[in-house]
């Protein structure tokens, strides 16, 4: 139960931060381009790289800290960071084909799923 709570707390903080970054970039740069989403995805990818190295590899941190920061906080801030870490991990393990398939499938299938969801709802309207 404590692990789920840590994920929830981290996720709430990450989600709030994502919201505030989105609002800030909207005020600063306007609505013509999704700057907020781009910002959280790039920053989240950098931060997950830092956390993965420090928490998991250098300090051998507890499962709870990983759940709070990586699964919770970064999961709430951006799921793109988790996707990117998974893809890089495949490439670093020498699994280039799997990494390429995972990357193309993740982006392609995600975009197809969004298009399908839009089409379903538009058809029902």
UniProtKB/Swiss-Prot annotation:
The keyword Chaperone does not apply. Na(+) is not transported, but it plays an essential structural role and its presence is essential for fluoride channel function. It is found in: Cell inner membrane. The keyword Iron does not apply. GO terms for cellular component: plasma membrane. The chain crosses the membrane at residues 1-21, 32-52, 68-88, 101-121. InterPro entries: FluC. It is a multi-pass membrane protein. It catalyses: fluoride(in) = fluoride(out). Fluoride-specific ion channel. Important for reducing fluoride concentration in the cell, thus reducing its toxicity. This is Fluoride-specific ion channel FluC. It comes from Rhizobium leguminosarum bv. trifolii (strain WSM2304). The gene is fluC.
């Amino acid at each position: 139960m404590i692990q789920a709570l840590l994920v929830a707390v981290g996720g709430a903080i990450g989600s709030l931060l994502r919201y505030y970054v989105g609002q800030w970039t909207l005020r600063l740069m306007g609505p013509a381009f999704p700057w907020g989403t781009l910002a959280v995805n790039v920053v989240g990818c950098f931060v997950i790289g830092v956390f993965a190295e420090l928490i998991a590899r250098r300090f051998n941190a507890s499962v709870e800290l990983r759940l709070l920061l990586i699964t919770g906080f970064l999961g709430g801030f951006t799921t793109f960071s988790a996707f990117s870490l998974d893809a890089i991990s495949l490439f670093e393990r020498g699994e280039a084909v799997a990494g390429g398939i995972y990357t193309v499938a993740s982006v392609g299938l995600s975009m197809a799923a969004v298009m399908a969801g839009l089409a379903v709802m538009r058809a029902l309207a």
